[in-house]
Amino acid sequence: MDPQQKGIVNTCFLTTRIPSWAGARQNVTGSDLGGKPVPSDVLESGRPLAAPRVRTLYEEQQLNMLTVNVILDDLKTQVAAMQNSVTAIQEELKDLKQRVAAR
């Protein structure tokens, strides 16, 4: 191997032959070889880490509320349909009782 080419990766894939001085990938938030975080120069670094989680949790709660509201509307529709069925059955029973009483 040519000494000037030592440590150079000539493929589009990362391999395990990258020397230890190469560090982590550039322009991404990741970790170095020791497991410590490496900040990105490109990604936004001024925002607090908890902010996306709080916003995501809030959005998730809103979606859950929408889902619950849809389920409640479906249940209300089903209950109304069942009440109409019960009313129709009660009217049929009333008619049958009148027919039986007339005989």
Swiss-Prot record:
<dbReference type="GO" id="GO:0098021">
    <property type="term" value="C:viral capsid, decoration"/>
</dbReference>
<feature type="coiled-coil region">
    <location>
        <begin position="72"/>
        <end position="99"/>
    </location>
</feature>
<dbReference type="Pfam" id="PF03955">
    <property type="entry name" value="Adeno_PIX"/>
</dbReference>
<feature type="region of interest" description="Disordered">
    <location>
        <begin position="25"/>
        <end position="45"/>
    </location>
</feature>
<keyword id="KW-1160">Virus entry into host cell</keyword>
<dbReference type="InterPro" id="IPR005641">
    <property type="entry name" value="Hexon_assoc_IX"/>
</dbReference>
<dbReference type="GO" id="GO:0042025">
    <property type="term" value="C:host cell nucleus"/>
</dbReference>
<comment type="similarity">
    <text>Belongs to the adenoviridae hexon-interlacing protein family.</text>
</comment>
<comment type="subunit">
    <text>Homotrimer. Interacts with hexon protein; this interaction tethers the hexons together. Self-interacts with adjacent proteins. Interacts with kinesin light chain KLC1; this interaction leads to capsid disruption at the nuclear pore complex during virus entry into host cell.</text>
</comment>
<keyword id="KW-1232">Capsid decoration protein</keyword>
<dbReference type="GO" id="GO:0031423">
    <property type="term" value="F:hexon binding"/>
</dbReference>
<protein>
    <recommendedName>
        <fullName>Hexon-interlacing protein</fullName>
    </recommendedName>
</protein>
<keyword id="KW-0167">Capsid protein</keyword>
<keyword id="KW-1048">Host nucleus</keyword>
<comment type="function">
    <text>Structural component of the virion that acts as a cement protein on the capsid exterior and forms triskelion structures consisting of three molecules that stabilize three hexon trimers at the center of each icosahedral facet and fixes the peripentonal hexons. Dispensable for assembly. During virus entry, recruits the anterograde motor kinesin-1 to the capsid docked at the nuclear pore complex thereby subjecting the docked capsid to a pulling force.</text>
</comment>
<keyword id="KW-0945">Host-virus interaction</keyword>
<keyword id="KW-0175">Coiled coil</keyword>
<keyword id="KW-0946">Virion</keyword>
<dbReference type="GO" id="GO:0046718">
    <property type="term" value="P:symbiont entry into host cell"/>
</dbReference>
